Curated annotation (Swiss-Prot):
GO annotation (BP), single: protein localization
Major location (coarse): cytoplasm
Keyword annotations: Cytoplasm, Nucleus
Gene behind the chain: DIF1
Protein name (database record): Damage-regulated import facilitator 1
Native organism taxonomy: Eukaryota, Fungi, Dikarya, Ascomycota, Saccharomycotina
Length: 158
């Protein structure tokens, strides 16, 4: 038995698939599509400034892109800009609240001031009522005081 110093060569059972460039010709463009959309929206909001609607309307109807880009100063065509001057935008006025703002609770809920002393007093009352309920409950008191233990059927009271 001789041990050879060379490692055995593995035989490939299948041929590797070669990547084709034609299949993914738009891959690079698609990977940056979201960023390009964000940039176009950002440029559109910053670049288009409508100061004089009469000049912009004339430029939009003139049909030459050179005059349109010189009117709005941003290099955008006014064909892309929406002209909503014929629609009236209602002016919203904020309604003044009453002197006492409405309560954020229903009629059954008792409203209390935010006072730490009252809260602690109510907490003490609630905790003492919980303790009383536990002590009154025969099953709960025995489980609470002696720990959880199993009972037989004979121990149950009907």
């Amino acid at each position: 038995m001789t041990v050879s110093s060379q490692s055995p060569v593995k035989k490939q059972l299948h041929n590797a698939i070669q990547p084709s460039n034609g299949q993914y010709e738009y891959h690079d463009k698609l990977s940056t599509l979201g960023m390009r959309i964000r940039q176009a929206v950002d440029n559109g909001y910053q670049g288009v400034s409508v100061h004089n609607t009469a000049n912009n309307t004339i430029a939009a109807t003139s049909g030459s892109n050179g005059s349109n880009s010189s009117i709005n100063g941003a290099g955008f065509s006014n064909i892309c800009v929406q002209d909503n001057t014929r629609f009236t935008i209602p002016e919203y006025k904020r309604v003044a609240l009453a002197k006492q703002p409405p309560m954020l609770v229903n009629q059954r809920t008792v409203s209390m001031n935010s006072n730490l002393e009252q809260w602690e007093q109510n907490l003490d009352q609630r905790l003492s009522s919980i303790d009383d309920d536990i002590m009154r409950n025969k099953l709960g008191a025995s489980d609470f005081l002696s720990g959880a233990s199993k009972r037989s059927f004979d121990d149950l009271e009907f």
